[in-house]
Amino acid sequence: MSINVKVKIMTEKEKQQKGMLYQANDPEVLKDLYYCENECFEINQIPPSRREERMERLRKLFGKAGEGMFIVAPFFCDYGYNIEVGENFFANTNCVILDEAKVTFGDNVFIAPNCAFYTAGHPLDVEQRNKKIEYALPIHVGNNVWIGGNVVVVPGVTIGDNTTIGAGSVVTHDIPSGVVAAGNPCRVIRKLEE
């Protein structure tokens, strides 16, 4: 008796999307990365007098873009199609979204200058890291969130609805809804009144 088993070998891109370790310099992964790098460069060259053109290019680049989205140049992301923004999204200058995994922003999210959202992570094992092995975990930002200037959000973090993140924070773990949080690492300072 023989058993016929089919094993599907996952591509590096599929591993990336599932949060598994993947080869970051895989040709399929790099193709999308280089395409987006070029798109971001071109979008950032569009003058302020043609803002609507810039927003339209970003809407096409993103996986989802709600009404009222506005992003101040320069802006940078790795893939674009992993980014979903809700209604009335605003990101000030120098926003960086390394979207190796899904990054979702709810409605009425406001981001101050120089903020970074990193879904990409690297193994602590030096040999793996030196072989360009990475992993990616999603980031989720709820509705009605204000993120102060120079904030960094790391892989796998969720920020709840109606929350404010103070300037200069490094968000390394989930932050609940309805709070003010700040610091390095970011922690809840107080609950907001309902």
Name each model-derived stretch.
Residues 57, 73-74:
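Arg/Lys-rich RNA-binding interfaces used to dock onto structured RNA substrates
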